UniProtKB/Swiss-Prot annotation:
GB1/RHD3-type G domain: residues covered: 37-252
Parts forming coiled coils: 217-242
UniProt keyword annotations, A-Z: Coiled coil, Endoplasmic reticulum, GTP-binding, Hydrolase, Membrane, Nucleotide-binding, Transmembrane, Transmembrane helix
Matches recorded under InterPro entries: G_GB1_RHD3_dom, P-loop_NTPase, RHD3/Sey1, Sey1/RHD3-like_3HB
GO CC term, one of those recorded: endoplasmic reticulum membrane
Protein's name in the database: Protein ROOT HAIR DEFECTIVE 3 homolog 1
Family to which the UniProt record says this protein belongs: Belongs to the TRAFAC class dynamin-like GTPase superfamily. GB1/RHD3 GTPase family. RHD3 subfamily.
Sequence ranges of Low complexity compositional bias: 758-781, 814-828
Organism the protein comes from: Oryza sativa subsp. japonica (Rice)
Function: Probable GTP-binding protein that may be involved in cell development.
Stretches of the chain found on the membrane's Lumenal side: 702-704
Pfam families referenced in this protein's UniProt entry, alphabetically: RHD3_GTPase (PF05879), Sey1_3HB (PF20428)
EC number assigned by the record: 3.6.5.-
Length: 854
């Protein structure tokens, strides 16, 4: 602090009553008053104009107030209120020099500023010096009486006034001792106090409640300057430690902290200028409110720009910060302590309230960082839980035990991390984030649990599917009386091998027995559904299977060798056996049989369909007499019905229609074989032919061309008869047969001739190539067949080859129509029609008849 600058007087309020805030702020900064807290005192001086007030202050406190120049005349020197700091006196003492009263410049009637300045001095001063002349003591019309009356009057305007020390300084003391002057002065003061109108609350209040009255005397400065200076120095000693108990202002009340002195003074003067009653307690609260707000705002700004806080905030954005709670708590505590240090002297209630607001703002500022820290801890806890759980499960530990141990350790670690992140200044509750972490762990555990259970279930299902699908399909392909018994045994064997292993794996999850049994039951139901779905799939292709079974039995013997229809076979019996085998297959696929209870499906189908009792025996028989005129099987649950009785009846009709061709073909083949291997005509017929046809025979022998033409004609007619299937065409009548044969005759004849010509050209080409390449050898020439003779491999023989192929129906899978949902069998008739073989009738057996002409 620059003492010279501090002692320099600064105008606080000018002569017009305007508060000089700028110059006052410069004074406060230069004098260092703001940092004194409550350890400062304010001294002001009142008195008549030109009574030596400024001189006394300069001598007493070492200030530099402007003094009157007596050589220029007696006039007003101090205008308004001036302020300076006392040099060399502790505690810090601020001195105010007020404009003198009773000055001719303002006039007798202009006392407004006088009263306002007096009230201002009483409101902010701890000690008020009353400068008065010694010769005025005891006078009725003394110059000091209006001043005292003014002081006492304005004191009444102070609501709950503070106690102020009034130090009467008697100037130009005479020979009368002070001991005699003081009682007279006090008596005059009491009279003036009694004469002042007071509120009812203070009507009988003694002056000592408002003022601490003290009296001192000083000799004349002009006449006894040395003595004056000595006594002034003695008086100066009384201002040392003036605010300490027993000092001049030891019992002062309502002190405003030094940092709020300037603002308080400005607001008090504003109220006084508005001619309002001055409520000092309320003013004290107001000053405390404003100053505490300023201090709090300043400390909050300091926190926002604090380098440590900015670094901590930046670090926590990228990841968890070790020791976050301690670091953040230290930063907050530093700034809160600075607030407490500066605001400690203000009103406690206001200070505490503003501190709470500052604390709230600070916590709101730093809480996002705390929440970010918790978010990092939450993420880290969940990731660590996932990793540790996977490692624990991989080690072979049971799922429930692994979850229990891992959850407990990670939640405890997270709870400890949250506790370390909390600062002492806040009562942040992290139970919600802890609950969120718990839910995260539970959700992840549930997800892993469902995944593990699903994995176990899918693995068991896959094993069941592999164990059941192909064997069941194979059993259905070889359907027989024991098919369902074999399926039941297979189902029991595989489920008893797979389900216990599955149940053992579930033990590690420590689930309730009802839940475990439910999962095993569902898996068993899944195994049943595999069999049932396969049965439904095969039932949808039952017509194909029936035709395949029929073809296998009908076209092959008991050694599985293809049959050759030589005419010795009983086609009727073989066909009945083949149809019976197909009917048994139909009965197997008609219903699902999970129990060992026998049913009558095969018996009903055999008696109704195979024995030919599909239709009623008499016209009067009702539909109810037909056992297949129903949608359910007796003693079979509808849900286990694959093919209803009515569907079986429809399938059987379609099956018979589509297999009738194979039977007819077999019969035709037998007949052709018999015709091809028939005996020669009877002897009498041969004799008759020789006698009656002797001339014709001789003609043919004499002219071989006729014989050749006859042979060629025979072959053509024979080929046409085979191709046109004359016998079959005439089964529907003579006229339709003639029309049909006539329509097919010319195209068939053209095809035969084209075939013969092509085969002859190919054979001639082969002979020429062989003759050109073969070397000359000494061999007997091989006799070549005449061109008019046909070998077993002749073109005509090749032409007949497709007619002797054995019956082999094409197997084609039938895809169920999406629109058919009411029946297990999907469009059996259409499926059968798609599978109908397209073959020619075989009138002969090529293996036994080559039709060679030598």
């Amino acid at each position: 602090m620059d003492e010279a600058a501090a002692a320099e007087a600064v105008q606080l309020i000018d002569g017009e009553g305007e508060f000089a805030a700028d110059s006052a702020e410069r004074f406060m900064a230069a004098a260092g008053v703001a940092g004194c807290g409550l350890s400062y005192a304010v001294v002001s001086i009142m008195g008549p104009q030109s009574s030596g007030k400024s001189t006394l202050l300069n001598q007493l406190f070492g200030t530099n107030f402007r003094e009157m120049d007596a050589f220029r005349g007696r006039s007003q020197t101090t205008k308004g209120i001036w302020i300076a700091r006392c040099v060399g006196v502790e505690p810090c003492t601020v001195v105010m020099d007020l404009e003198g009263t009773d000055g001719r410049e303002r006039g007798e009637d202009d006392t407004a500023f006088e009263k306002q300045s007096s009230l201002f001095a009483l409101a902010i001063s701890d000690i008020v010096l009353i400068n008065m002349w010694c010769h005025d003591i005891g006078r009725e019309q003394a110059a000091n009486k209006p001043l005292l009356k003014t002081v006492f009057q304005v004191m009444m305007r102070l609501f709950s006034p503070r106690k102020t020390t009034l130090l009467f300084v008697i100037r130009d003391k005479t020979r009368t001792p002070l001991e005699h002057l003081e009682p007279v002065l006090r008596e005059d003061i009491q009279k003036i106090w009694n004469s002042v109108a007071k509120p009812e609350a203070h009507k009988d209040t003694p002056i000592s409640e408002f003022f601490n009255v003290q009296v001192t005397a000083l000799p004349s400065f002009e006449e006894k300057e040395e003595q004056f200076r000595e006594q002034v120095q003695q008086l100066r000693q009384r201002f040392s430690n003036s605010i300490a108990p027993g000092g001049l202002a030891g019992d002062r009340r309502g002190v405003v902290p030094a940092s709020g002195f300037l603002f308080s003074s400005q607001q008090i003067w504003k109220v006084i200028r508005e001619n309002k009653d001055l409520d000092l307690p309320a003013h004290k609260v107001m000053v405390a409110t404003v100053r505490c707000d300023e201090i709090a705002h300043e400390k909050f700004s300091c926190l926002t720009s604090d380098a440590e806080w900015m670094e901590l905030e930046s670090d926590v954005q990228s990841g968890p910060v070790p020791g976050f709670g301690k670091k953040l708590g230290y930063i907050v505590d530093v700034h809160m302590q600075e607030y407490d240090k500066e605001a400690i002297y203000f009103d406690e209630a206001v200070r505490t309230a503003k501190r709470q607001l500052l604390k709230s703002r600070v916590l709101n500022l730093v809480q996002p960082a705390f929440q970010k820290m918790l978010a990092h801890l939450r993420t880290r806890a969940l990731e660590k839980y996932k990793t540790e759980l996977n490692l624990t499960l991989e080690s072979g530990k049971g799922f429930a035990a692994a979850v229990r141990d891992t959850t407990e350790s990670n939640l405890n670690e997270f709870d400890q991390g949250c506790a370390d992140a909390v600062i002492e200044q806040a009562d942040w509750d992290y139970s919600k984030i802890l609950e969120k972490v718990r839910r995260d762990v539970e959700d992840h555990t549930l997800s892993i649990r469902e995944g593990k259970l699903s994995e176990l279930t899918n693995h068991a299902k896959e094993k069941l599917r592999k164990a059941l699908v192909e064997p069941v399909e194979s059993l259905f392909d070889a359907a027989g009386p024991s098919t369902w018994a074999s399926i039941r045994n297979l189902f029991k064997r595989e489920t008893e091998a797979i389900l216990p292993e599955f149940q053992k794996n579930l033990a590690g999850f420590e689930m309730e027995s009802a839940t475990s049994e439910g999962m095993v039951s569902k898996l068993r139901d899944y195994a049943r559904s595999i069999v049932e779905n396969k049965a439904k799939e095969e039932a949808g292709k039952v017509l194909i299977h029936m035709k395949e079974r029929f073809t296998t039995v009908f076209s092959h013997d008991k050694d599985s060798i293809p049959r050759v229809w030589t005419g010795k076979e009983d086609v009727r019996a073989i066909a009945k056996d083949a149809r019976s085998a197909a009917l048994k297959l139909l009965s197997v696929l008609a219903a699902i049989r999970w129990d060992e209870k026998p049913d009558k499906i095969e018996k009903i189908l055999t008696s109704t369909l195979l024995d030919g009792s599909v239709t009623p025996k008499s016209k009067g028989a009702s539909a109810s007499s037909d056992p297949l005129a129903s949608t359910t099987w007796e003693e079979v649950s509808p849900k286990y019905t694959l093919i209803t009785p009515s569907q079986c009846k429809s399938l059987w009709k379609q099956f018979k229609a589509e297999t009738e061709f194979a039977i007819t073909q077999a019969v035709s083949t037998q007949q052709a074989h018999k015709r091809g291997n028939g005996r020669l005509p009877p002897p009498w017929a041969m004799v008759a032919i020789a006698v009656l046809g002797f001339n014709e025979i001789m003609t043919l022998l004499r002219n071989p061309i006729y014989l050749f033409l006859l042979f060629v004609g025979y072959l053509l007619v024979k080929a046409l008869a085979v191709q046109l299937d004359i016998n079959r065409e005439f089964q529907n009548g003579v006229v339709p047969g003639i029309i049909s044969v006539t329509a097919k005759l010319i195209p068939t004849l053209q095809n035969i001739l084209n075939k013969v010509a092509t085969e002859q050209q190919q054979q001639q080409g082969h002979h020429q190539d062989a003759a050109a390449e073969a070397p000359q050898q000494q061999q007997q020439p091989q006799p070549q067949p005449p061109p008019l003779l046909l070998s077993p491999r002749s073109p005509m023989s090749e032409l007949r080859r497709p007619l002797h192929m054995p019956f082999s129906p094409v197997r084609k899978a039938v895809s169920p129509s999406p629109s058919s949902s009411s029946s297990t069998v999907t469009s059996p008739r259409n499926a059968g029609e798609d599978q109908k073989p397209r073959q020619m009738v075989q009138p002969d057996n090529e293996s036994n008849n080559a039709y060679s002409i030598v």
